[in-house]
Amino acid sequence: MSNETIKLVIAGPRGRMGQEAVKLAERTPHFDLVGAIDHTYDQQKLSDVMPVESDAFIYTDIHACFTETQPDVLIDLTTPEIGKVHTKIALEHGVRPVVGTTGFSEADLKELTSLTEEKGIGAIIAPNFALGAILMMKFSKMAANYFEDVEIIELHHDQKLDAPSGTALKTAEMISEVRKEKQQGHPDEKEILPGARGAEQNGIRLHSVRLPGLIAHQEVMFGMDGQTLQIRHDSYNRASFMSGVKLSVEQVMKIDQLVYGLENIID
């Protein structure tokens, strides 16, 4: 598939991640950016409103965009609420969505799974597109077979809307698949300030840090008598996510089901 041209539409092209996705499309020979979806600048060229070379038109109407451009793949890098709507519409139009937003419920995923089966096309929803972050999650799941005590600290820029991050939640979920259930810490521990011990998922504590100067970082800390193990990943710029976006676009053309999490398409 990598030698065949893949027609792309990008939703949210002017956002920080969206700008990187436009650059990715421009420098990848077998990607053809045929349109973009935004809440403004309808029927203007991307090159007229952004420092890019693409002459693809911007659409404020997603249905019109899909009808006129006939894309193979939608790359959605918007918000959780908008991303949910775009994903469903894309599948209804026979367009394969690659989604980089979080916030999908079990009911949402079930509905989208039914749509992919009905249409016979693939969809990929990835809380994190950084390949290093995916490996961090895989390594953490491996370590959880031997270390029962674990806490997750995720650190992001101060404009991130959700906490804990989708990556932290996914990491906890993967660890829980192999970790023996255990209540960590002293059974009588008391929080002097509410929330001091962080959020909890399946007995795993999750801590969120939000500061300017950060991009996306996560540390998974394991401990047992006499030793600790720390697995950490850092994204220093948003270009770090593009290798995963590229892989997802290529892989979504080869599957006919919904995949949640990039770890499921990496051996």
Curated annotation (Swiss-Prot):
Q: Which residues bind (S)-2,3,4,5-tetrahydrodipicolinate?
A: 157, 166-167
Keyword NAD part of the UniProt annotation: yes
Where does the record place it? Answer: Cytoplasm
Give residues annotated as binding NAD(+). 12-17, 100-102, 126-129
Q: Which InterPro entries match?
A: DapB_C (IPR022663), DapB_N (IPR000846), DapB_N_CS (IPR022664), DHDPR_bac (IPR023940), NAD(P)-bd_dom_sf (IPR036291)
Primary subcellular site in the record, as a coarse category = cytoplasm
Q: Where is the active site?
A: 156 (proton donor/acceptor), 160 (proton donor)
In the UniProt record, does the keyword Oxidoreductase occur? yes
| Gene Ontology terms: cellular component | cytosol
Choose any GO biological process term that the UniProt entry carries and state it.
diaminopimelate biosynthetic process
Q: Which EC class is the enzyme in?
A: oxidoreductase
Q: Which Pfam families match?
A: DapB_C (PF05173), DapB_N (PF01113)
Question: Briefly, what is this protein's role?
Answer: Catalyzes the conversion of 4-hydroxy-tetrahydrodipicolinate (HTPA) to tetrahydrodipicolinate.
NCBIfam families linked? dapB (TIGR00036)
Protein name per its UniProtKB record: 4-hydroxy-tetrahydrodipicolinate reductase
Which lineage do the record's taxonomy fields give for this organism?
Answer: Bacteria, Bacillati, Bacillota, Bacilli, Bacillales
